[in-house]
């Protein structure tokens, strides 16, 4: 979060005096709303983020995909009957839920699918519900960061087909991404076509599971992190 134990960074300065290396990791809202703490920013030799939009807010960032244990779930490519679509907002405004929820409710009536809104549940409850679904709608509008985050990483690891809004910059950054790209205007039509094409859902389930394993598995992300350390002479 780009923070030490104290705002004046006295603890970090003590570590520097002990010849310790300092690295900062920015997760999104920290840099978007607060910015950097200058004393700590001056001392940090490595600044890492998994949020692509932060690159416009800091001149010295390195990227690392969100680390995750992608093997903790058993991958099941089967599709429910009826198809189950879920949306799991931690913050409705940031996820564009006011757009997503009415569209999914309409779809449930017209296409005979199930829509599950995952809110106000314990972590374990939310995970179990999400695992039982076929499609996750992550976000539209990109109000709280671009594209996708841990919500989608979890869902891809579970073998879900993931739908979200990716801006052109993100598509250029991850051109082999497994997401079905939508915006507020196209969401209903895209979902309407998707739920009538089970082969396409299966295709994206498989593609997503392979992609999240390649980029987000913690063994792969740790290799990226250690390469940054090696480049700085820390290993």
Say what each PLM segment does.
Residues 75-95, 101:
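Conserved donor-binding/catalytic core segment of Leloir-type glycosyltransferases
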Residues 101-122:
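A conserved nucleotide-sugar
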Residues 139-149, 164-178:
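Nucleotide-sugar-dependent
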